[in-house]
Amino acid sequence: DEVAEIAQRYADNMASITVKSTDATHPQNGMSFGDLGETDLMEIGAGQHGEGGGVRVPMMSSKETVATVADALCKKLELKAGDQTFVMVNGCGATTTMEMLVLFKDTVEFLKAKDIEVVASMVGEILTVQEAGGFQLNIAKWDDEFIRLWKAPCHTPAYSKA
């Protein structure tokens, strides 16, 4: 019950948006999952596995993209100056570590300008789709209990930290 309560409280205080720049491919036949194709467009609000439904816009810089999506997440979470957050940048499959780190830096700078503190973070390929270009930005409003739990050691088959 305690774990379910904490997980629900986390879900209630977290928001995410996926930005897709290239389509995923099927692992058996290499065919594209989507219809974005080779364009100069990106899709904001696409499903993590290439599902459509987002809005297609001309490709933007990292700073412009982060400003667009982080602003939407901040509004959804009703973040304000002094709030503490967890930020996760998840690559969609074909996004390089360098690209994810640039996106993370731009996210931290965006939040810092609003006096919103990033107290913990994760950057990497956590949930991916074969050859999909893009990223998922997750922001969660955290309290002291979430921070304490994050700092605790964790050892599981899928994730470990000391």
Tell where the protein language model's regions lie, with residue ranges.
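Mixed-charge interfacial surface used for oligomerization/domain docking
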Residues: 2-101
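C-terminal non-catalytic interaction/assembly regions of soluble proteins
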Residues: 72-162
